[in-house]
Regions:
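A short helix->loop->beta-strand "cap" motif at the edges of active sites that frequently abuts
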Residues: 24, 85-88, 111-113
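Alpha-helical structural signal in soluble globular domains
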Residues: 39-43, 83, 103-107, 111
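Rossmann-like NAD(P)-binding element
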Residues: 40, 48-100
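NAD(P)+-binding Rossmann beta1-loop-alpha1 motif at the extreme N-terminus of oxidoreductases
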Residues: 1-62, 124-127
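Hydrophobic residues in well-ordered beta-strands that form the structural core
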Residues: 29, 49, 92, 115-117
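Short, well-ordered alpha-helices that flank and scaffold nucleotide-derived cofactor binding pockets
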Residues: 17, 21, 75, 106
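Rossmann-fold dinucleotide-binding core
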Residues: 3, 96-130
């Protein structure tokens, strides 16, 4: 299974590292700034564009700060959703508003992509601990 992870900030970077530690080594990562991507590449992940993640991954995970960013990444021009294949799964770990989640879900359903709204909390220490 190939996993894509978008958003490598305070929570996302340790979450992605935990996927690698758990044996999910076919992990593609993306972030606006390149430093966390490079850190995860050194740990075994592969840096990728959002388009590559959409095209290649069976599961796409986002951990982004807010609703507008998740909508832009998924539904914006050349967004991840436009490249996802039927049967893929999108897991949003961001804390976004329900209206945005429903909008993203509706668009993904048109493509045969499933969505799991799975916001996380606990801050960096809990993300590191897994």
């Amino acid at each position: 299974m190939k996993i894509g992870f978008i958003g490598l900030g305070i929570m996302g970077k340790p979450m992605a590292k935990n996927l690698l530690k758990a044996g999910y080594t076919d992990l593609l990562v993306n972030n606006r700034s390149q430093a966390p991507v490079q850190e995860l590449e050194a740990a075994g992940a592969t840096g990728a564009t959002q388009q590559e993640i959409g095209e290649q991954c069976d599961v796409v995970i986002t951990m982004l700060p807010n609703s507008p960013q998740v909508k832009e990444v998924m539904l914006g021009e050349n967004g991840v959703a436009s490249h996802m294949k039927p049967g893929a799964v999108f897991i949003d770990c961001s804390s976004i508003n329900p209206v945005a989640s429903k909008e993203i879900y509706a668009e993904l359903q048109k493509k045969g992509v499933e969505m799991l709204d799975a916001p996380v909390s606990g801050g960096e220490p809990k993300a590191i601990d897994g």
